[in-house]
Amino acid sequence: MKLSLLRHGEPVGGRIYRGNQDDPLTEKGWQQMLDATQNQSWDLIITSPLLRCQSFAQHLHQQQKSSLEIVDNFLELGFGDWQGQSSMQIGQDLVDAFKLSPIENKPPNAEDLYDFQHRVLNAFKIITAKKSNSALIIAHAGVIRVIKSYLLNLPIEKMFTIDVLSASCEEFEI
């Protein structure tokens, strides 16, 4: 199966720890995603239910006439008390500590990283068991980091060493 992982484009509200906050894409975010998927097609499109992913997935689904699945387990990591705040509001030292050691330094009231990994990979394994020639997962940086960590055999504690830019699209053969 050809598997593509696409992070959503720029959302309304700027660079914050958004988590499950349901912000739509900006015009720039839409254009980023159009550019990232230009001249490509997939048999199956899988998306997070959040607007910044699902709205574009619906558009692509209608355009390509491909199958579409909305997967709740592809929601972004819940950032607890950090949700809706920028790195500057949180404190760069706390953000750096979290990225370096996310198990020991998780944000207050945040989702457990192992629970997050478990829910994402459960959904991912169901998807990869499907008989599809090509699939596109439209999701969030955290979800994509978990999947890439799994595919690259990296421990989940190292997921923040993986860069996932807005509207970046990577392809894997699985």
Give the residues covered by each predicted segment.
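Short beta-strand scaffold positions
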Residues: T47-S48, H118, I138-A139
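General small-molecule cofactor/ligand-binding pocket signal
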Residues: S4, E69-V71, E173
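Phosphate-handling substructures
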Residues: P24, Q62-L121
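GST superfamily/GST-like fold recognition
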Residues: A141-R145, S168
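Active-site-proximal alpha-helix that buttresses catalytic centers in soluble enzyme cores
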Residues: K2-Q64
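Domain-level recognition of soluble alpha/beta enzyme cores
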Residues: L152-I174
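Generic beta-sheet signal
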Residues: L3, K131-G142
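Glycine-rich phosphate-binding loop signature in dinucleotide/nucleotide-binding domains
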Residues: N39-S41, I127-N133
